[in-house]
Structures are given as C-alpha cells and as structure tokens.
Amino acid sequence: MPPGRRRYAEIINSEGEGGSLPQAEIGIIGGSGLYNLPGIERVREVRVATPFGRPSDAYRLGNLEGRKVAFLSRHGRGHTLLPTEVNSRANIYGFKKLGVERIISVSAVGSLREEYRPMDMALPAQFFDRTRQRASTFFGGGLVVHISFDTPVCPTVVEVLAGACKDLGVRCHAGGTYVCMEGPAFSTKAESNVYRSWGMDLIGMTSLPEAKLAREAEICYATLAMVTDYDCWHPQHDAVTINMVLEYLTHNVENSQKILLRAIRAMPQPRSCKCASALAHAILTDRTRISSTARKKLSLLVGKYLG
C-alpha cells in the first residue's frame, strides 16, 4: 500500500478505535501556495472523517513559529471544486476535530471601490450573503441553534493581521463589507453597480458560509482578502478574467506568506474573545427534546452545553 494511503488508513483506524488525531491551534484555509510556508517543520497530512462528508482535501499539519498549525486547500489541490461544491461544513468541522481555535481564511476578491486597488490586502469587518445553494449551518434535525452574527469576524485575529500588514509595509484596508456571491460566473455590470450602490466594498465567492460555520463551531475567524481586480464596474479597467486573477494571486502569494508568518507568531493565547462561547446562549431546543441521534452527531460542538 502506498505510504499516503497507509497513513490515511492508520488515522481512520485510530479514530474508529477511540484514538486521537494530531492537534493544531491555528487553521489556514487557502490555496496550495500557502501549504509550504518557510520554516514549517514536522509536516504531516491527515484526512479527517466528519458527519458532514469529506473535507476538500487532507489537512496539512506542522509546527510554525512555535505554534501548531493546520492548512487546508479550500478548492482541493489542483483546484477541482467550484465555490458551490466546497463542503464548508466538513472543512470547518474537521478543523474543530483537530482542536483548531482560530482560522485565517485567505481568498481572492474583487474591489468595488476605487481605493481598494489590485495587490492591496483587505480585512473585511462585515459580510453580505448572496449565496443560494450552500448549507450554512451544522444544526437542524431536532436541534435548533441561533448564533449572534452581528460581528462576523474575530476582532483579535483581525487586529493581529492588521498589525502584521503594518509591520511589513503592506497596503491593507481594515474594515468594509465583503459581498459573497454564489458564482462561478463573475458579476454582470448591473450586479457590480448595484453592490456598489448598496455600499459593498469587496466581492468574492468563498467567505460564506465559512464564517457562519466557524462561529457555530466557536472558532475565531477572519478573512485575509487579496484584491485582484475591479470586478467589472470600473470604466478604466478591463472586466475581471481568470487570467487577471491568477496573475495578481501569483504576485501576492509572497506577501500572504509573510503576513501569515508574522500573524501566527503574534497570535495571543489564551483566547479572550466571545467567539469561544458563541453557543452559550444560542441553543433554543428544550434539552429534554433533543434526540440521542442529534446529541451524538453534534456532541463535538454542543456537548459541553448539554451535559
């Protein structure tokens, strides 16, 4: 049996027999260019089984800047998954199973504002959901949960990322609203201009439902957005194409790596934000009416509140 498959079989067996998975504290979701950060040590790949299906890829775990980190390729290695096809529930649940407490999501975005220029970084403070075909909650099936989501990103993680950008001299916009579209087609001019009239600043296809699911899993979450284009509204710039996006992404990978390295090193412990207790007052279902099936399926997320 090839080494990769043998490692996967061993992990599945250890889970089935009550064994433990290797643990991490910081998760990174992004492209394959982030897998090989300079200085990462003791690298191993882990496939994680979840009640929500298979994650996009194996998690790549290692030690970096004295911290245990886990990387996941959102669209799978080789970019085989459309944004709609990404199993965000499995991806986030897998991070939770690995013990991750904070997630940095790295993604490409279009700019809806003149001041957000290609090659800039952005740390959106708000999301506007325009997706239509994605499962956006772990709950249901007899267990009703309503999380607070007025502040969808973790202020601590955003502050650390903003500080890293400042220290490195990388032009970064902290704040603003990211509208998440379904895709895979880019916007029409009508859509792009409507989003601008609504006060949106950035447009992308990936941060939702990730951010909602991370909050349900009580994992801190923030998006490090790489601006690659002006969508299609700007009269002095061509409409976005995949070649344009890839060109700017290639140029921005080095900046992203440097920001992540500095942010991972600076991330404070232990957590003091509200993300860690997001479900404390969010479970609505009468505890006596929650089925054993729901309890078992979701025990990783709600077990500490159900007793």
Predicted segment positions?
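A short, charged, Gly/Pro-tolerant segment at domain boundaries
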Residues: S272-G307
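Non-catalytic positions within long, well-ordered alpha-helices that form the structural scaffold/packing
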Residues: K96-G99, R196, R215
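Metabolite-binding pocket within alpha/beta catalytic cores that recognizes anionic/polar moieties
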Residues: E15-T151, Y305-G307
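Generic non-transmembrane alpha-helical segments
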Residues: T156, V160-R171, K258-A266
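Intrinsic disorder/low-complexity segments
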Residues: M1-L21
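His/Asp/Glu-rich mid-to-C-terminal helical/loop segments that flank catalytic regions of hydrolases
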Residues: C232-L279
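Active-site/ligand-binding-proximal alpha/beta "capping" segment
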Residues: D167-D201, T288
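Zn-dependent metallopeptidase/amidohydrolase metal-coordination segment
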Residues: M205-N243
